């Protein structure tokens, strides 16, 4: 898969999950934050990143920078959905993603919905199977979207002209 230059795209970011973690030290608890962020151009390019810092805005900024380094291209058919059904895996999390007819909308749970909206998918059905942890769901959704190939790409690979 080729590298996508984030500077050429008009990316929007969406915070999926913010987590506060504590390190226990002699004087008490030391708090830190991690932010799971999804970025996308709404036209087939989408990425995710995890930022960690002592303050929330800094964690989000780091997450966005990480997400820009992790962009994938999603094939969108008929201007609104994916070409075929796919199952993405990550850890114990699995996400089933199905194409939907026009007017259906994005039917997905919180973390997966953010990924599909950032990618520019307007009609898609999805179901989280197994783990509902936002990190696993986002990574499983990405795994599923990364497996997708456009109909033209599949025809070229098989040597079919029409």
From Swiss-Prot:
InterPro entries: Ribosomal_Su5_D2-typ_SF, Ribosomal_uS5, Ribosomal_uS5_bac-type, Ribosomal_uS5_C, Ribosomal_uS5_N, Ribosomal_uS5_N_CS, Ribsml_uS5_D2-typ_fold_subgr. The keyword Nucleotide-binding does not apply. It comes from the Bacteria. Keywords: Ribonucleoprotein, Ribosomal protein, RNA-binding, rRNA-binding. GO terms for biological process: translation. One of its GO terms (molecular function) is rRNA binding. Pfam families: Ribosomal_S5, Ribosomal_S5_C. The N-terminal domain interacts with the head of the 30S subunit; the C-terminal domain interacts with the body and contacts protein S4. The interaction surface between S4 and S5 is involved in control of translational fidelity. Part of the 30S ribosomal subunit. Contacts proteins S4 and S8. This is Small ribosomal subunit protein uS5. The lineage of its organism: Bacteria, Pseudomonadati, Thermodesulfobacteriota, Desulfuromonadia, Geobacterales. The gene is rpsE.
């Amino acid at each position: 898969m080729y590298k996508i230059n984030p500077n050429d795209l008009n990316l929007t970011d969406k915070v999926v999950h913010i987590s506060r973690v504590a390190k226990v030290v002699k004087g008490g608890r030391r708090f830190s934050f991690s932010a799971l962020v999804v970025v996308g151009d709404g036209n087939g390019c989408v990425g995710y990143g995890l930022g960690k810092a002592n303050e929330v805005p800094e964690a989000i900024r780091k997450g966005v920078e990480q997400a820009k380094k992790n962009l994938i291209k999603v094939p969108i058919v008929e201007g609104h959905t994916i070409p075929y059904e796919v199952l993405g895996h990550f850890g114990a999390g699995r996400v089933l993603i199905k194409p939907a007819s026009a007017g259906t909308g994005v039917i997905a749970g919180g973390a997966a919905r953010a990924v599909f909206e950032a990618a520019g998918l307007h009609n898609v059905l999805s179901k989280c199977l197994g783990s509902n942890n936002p990190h696993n769901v986002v990574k499983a959704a990405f795994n599923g979207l990364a497996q997708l190939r456009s109909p033209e790409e599949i025809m070229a690979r098989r040597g079919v002209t029409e």
